[in-house]
């Protein structure tokens, strides 16, 4: 089995879990006051695409470090995503170099894409958001395949 087959199989096997997680998330949000609109459906689909990026990032991390290091590194990545996506506060509030770094990472683009889809408001969504996300999306998938393949070869020696 090629490493790309293994990674693709792993991603595909997690998509039903991602779908269930999204449905439960939006049901909870509706119970807590989110108005049900038809835009929730495309938001779930967009979220699933973005989830593929994060699954691939997890595979990449798992291929780079041993099982003891993945927990700590995973926690650091989660906080990095939260701080650089604008999830806690708008990145424009800090501005400067921090804003430039955040806008060059895929996390702010992911949040903007999901928010725009959910609110049916694509005014803040630019081509740059899509390009930044796609570059990281493709790069992380390719890197995870390459690193996983090298890890498989080194483990078989």
Model-derived features with residue positions:
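Transmembrane alpha-helix boundary/anchor motif
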Residues: 23, 27, 56, 89-96, ...
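Short, membrane-exposed interhelical loops at transmembrane-helix boundaries
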Residues: 105-121
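Transmembrane helix segments
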Residues: 65-104, 108
């Amino acid at each position: 089995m090629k490493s790309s087959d293994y990674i693709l199989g792993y991603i595909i096997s997690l998509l039903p879990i991602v779908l269930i997680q999204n449905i439960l998330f939006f049901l909870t949000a509706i119970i807590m006051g989110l108005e049900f609109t038809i835009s929730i459906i495309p938001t779930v689909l967009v979220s699933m695409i973005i989830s593929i990026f994060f699954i691939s990032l997890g595979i990449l991390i798992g291929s780079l470090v041993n099982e003891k290091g993945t927990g700590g590194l995973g926690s650091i990545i989660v906080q990095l995503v939260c701080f650089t996506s604008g999830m806690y506060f708008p990145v424009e509030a800090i501005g400067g170099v921090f804003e430039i770094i955040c806008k060059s990472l895929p996390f702010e683009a992911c949040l903007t894409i999901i928010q725009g889809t959910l609110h049916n408001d694509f005014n803040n969504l630019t081509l740059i958001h899509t390009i930044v996300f796609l570059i990281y999306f493709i790069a992380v998938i390719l890197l995870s395949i390459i690193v996983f393949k090298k890890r498989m070869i080194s483990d078989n020696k």
